[in-house]
């Protein structure tokens, strides 16, 4: 469950939800929606909104990546062999998720191995394991890296400005890229999305672009009209009910 809030409503939202829902709180994504404010005089410029994330059980999660910046690459990919520079990836289990228990090459990790023994043996034969003093690690080469995993601070998706009249058709309209990232991350390809506050229909449009089913609704007739027009323009087949 993703709930978008501006900077001053987080406490109200968490205060209003029931104890059961509050216990499912997972993380707070900080979305930098704009650049610096030049008109501030007596306080901090509010350029960040929050996206509160709640989860139940162990839901689907697909890691998203962004291009490596120079500083990150320099600090992370500092090991080198004859194949090139590489970073160290996890090869063992964790306390919260015990791995495969076995001894290999003199190592017997407390929480097991991340992979089954035959997979670990294959990595060893391919010289893809960095044997550290205390733990082994999987080599991740710079030229094969997917990029830097996106964390809970998003500064690469900007809000739709008021001047972009051809793009902004609803007061609370969110950028399409924002919804597409959320859906790719938390909804499997055969999954379904529910948006109880349709607004401009951006969530439904993002689902259409990504091949997911979506059910959305709104009490505002203006919202339904705007969303319907946007979806039809995109070539989406829709079913509407009042």
Where are each of the predicted segments found?
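Long, charged amphipathic helices and adjacent flexible linkers at domain junctions
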Residues: 240-242
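Core catalytic lobe of class I
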Residues: 1-238
């Amino acid at each position: 469950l993703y709930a978008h809030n501006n900077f001053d409503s987080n406490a109200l939202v968490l205060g209003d939800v029931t104890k059961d829902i509050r216990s499912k709180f997972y993380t707070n994504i900080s979305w930098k929606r704009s650049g610096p404010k030049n008109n501030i005089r007596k306080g901090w410029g509010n350029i960040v909104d929050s996206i509160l994330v709640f989860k139940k059980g162990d839901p689907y999660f697909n890691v998203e990546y962004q291009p490596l910046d120079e500083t990150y690459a320099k600090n992370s990919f500092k090991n080198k062999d004859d194949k090139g520079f590489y970073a160290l990836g996890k090869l063992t289990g964790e306390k919260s998720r015990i791995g495969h228990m076995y001894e290999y090459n003199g190592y017997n990790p407390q929480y097991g191995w991340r992979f089954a023994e035959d997979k670990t043996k294959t990595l060893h034969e391919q010289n893809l394991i960095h044997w550290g003093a205390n733990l082994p690690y999987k080599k991740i080469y710079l030229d094969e890296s997917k990029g830097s995993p996106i964390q809970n601070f998003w500064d690469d998706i900007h809000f739709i400005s008021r001047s972009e009249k051809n793009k902004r058709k609803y007061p609370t309209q969110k950028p399409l890229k924002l919804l597409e990232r959320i859906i790719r991350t938390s909804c499997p390809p055969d999954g379904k999305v529910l948006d109880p506050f349709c607004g401009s229909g951006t969530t439904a449009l993002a689902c259409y672009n990504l091949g997911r089913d979506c059910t959305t609704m709104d009490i505002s007739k203006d919202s339904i009209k705007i969303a319907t027009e946007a979806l039809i323009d995109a070539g989406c087949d829709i079913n509407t009910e009042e």
